Amino acid sequence: IKVEAVKARGAKVILHGDTYDEASAHAQQLMQEKGMTYVHPYDDPDVIAGQGTVGMEILRQHPDNLHAVFIPVGGGGLCAGVAAYIKFVRPDVKIFAVEAEESACLAAAMQQKKRVKLPQVGLFADGTAVAQIGEETFRVIKKTIDGVITVSTDEICASIKDIFEDTRSIAEPSGALALAGLKKYAAEQSL
């Protein structure tokens, strides 16, 4: 669906490799060979700032009784941007990063206190299946989040089902991470 949507807007789509790292390496090779511009999908200050506008929208829609925000994480651009904005404007709001257990590169990095490259990642939540958190995103995230929640494939599937039952929309697995994290947090905190 994503690829077709991009093609429908007139872009030439080049699919290469089975992992994000393989696709990124190929894109950088094309940049060198053909003089193209490479815009990193998450580890770029402008991309992070752009994704931070989601945090602005959240605060506009919920100006008062907002206690916590749960953000899906792959490479970390969305999480870094949203967390930086919300913590600057509303430092009282808790920020939780949510990852699939099979691609929990942020949780590993937070535990080791440095970026860690996972030997392999699962592809169920393919939109967030990244082996290593971004360098700039990790720098921002480690200063702005209150915790990392990892969720299983079963927890993600349950959240996809919940979203469908509530909205009649089918969420992709990465799109259901935040709800899965919220549900796990609520259960652990007996909320």
Feature locations, PLM:
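PLP-dependent amino-acid enzyme catalytic core
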Residues: 1-191
